[in-house]
Amino acid sequence: MKDSAEFQEKKDLRKKRLQGKAIKNVGILWPYLLIPIHLITLKPLLFYLKTVIIDFFLLQFKVKWGWKKTSIAQVTDVIDEGIPFLPEKSDIYLDFINFWIRSLNFTVLRLGRKKALPHLAGFMAAIGTAYHEAARVYKIRMSTTPRPAVGKNKNMQTIHRLDPHLLCVPSLHVGVVVLTHTFFTAVFRQEGLSQEEQEQYSTELWEGAVEIAETVLYVKQHSVNCIPAALYMMTHLLKDQFTIQDAINFIDCLFVDTSHISAEQGKVIRNHIHYMFDRLLLEGCNEDDWIVPVLRWLMSQPVTEV
């Protein structure tokens, strides 16, 4: 009884400490301290890092440095021309990694280290799988879009220096933020957080995911064609957790509340993403592998030989 009382007291204290705080304000420390030193989390971490290094960075730089010859699909759309280039939004774009690391950190602070570890391991396994699955497309057909000159914006200079910009479809930025919202919403529900907490944190992650998804277009790192492919991928990787209806709801939230484009242009963007998402669904319904309709579309696009 004493142990049970102490456990409940610690649980209540953790909840009290986080009361009123947003996930974006809790920092990023604990994942860096915990994940590398526990076998349960180290194994998926190593798989994730290996995939990022080999199947994301090295895959692109081999082409950039002339070590590999390939065809690169040009996946831009005329709709992209109506979306302004906003380098000042690069902070949001670059926050993509901390977006999920903060969610891991919050999970540790809210649940305690012991209870959080399986969830940390689960997320690292899931994000590693997302990168691995996207790389199956990248290895067959790379894709790119035109990028404007970055000027004096330091963030954009860093982005252009570190990202050769050859792996646009599907967008991992979009896939991972969708994964983050879906995964941690399920964790909060599974661990019995109050309804008020669940709504607060799930809403925060949803809005953050939408904001980052919009930003990939504002900083010209992706095309409107990259987003539906990512959402289609996640409906397969997350199965019943991220449904077709969830993807539709996500699209419906894009470019709704913004002063940077007109309401009419926002509607045009959403309609196109809906169209492409529906097309992938219809073409993929009789396929055994989700990458088939994505590759079919990529193979139909004009290419640059490098």
Predicted regions and their residues:
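Primarily interfacial, aromatic-capped hydrophobic alpha-helices that serve as membrane anchors
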Residues: 245-306
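Hydrophobic alpha-helical bundle signature of multipass membrane enzymes
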Residues: 7-167, 176-214
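Charged/polar, low-hydrophobicity segments characteristic of intrinsically disordered regions
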Residues: 136-142, 217-231, 270-275
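Alpha-helical transmembrane segments that form the membrane-embedded catalytic/substrate-binding core
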Residues: 176-180, 211-214, 218-245
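Non-catalytic, membrane-anchoring transmembrane segments at the edges
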Residues: 6-12, 16-17, 45-46, 233, ...
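Functional transmembrane or membrane-interface alpha-helices that line membrane-embedded catalytic
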Residues: 193-202, 231, 236-260
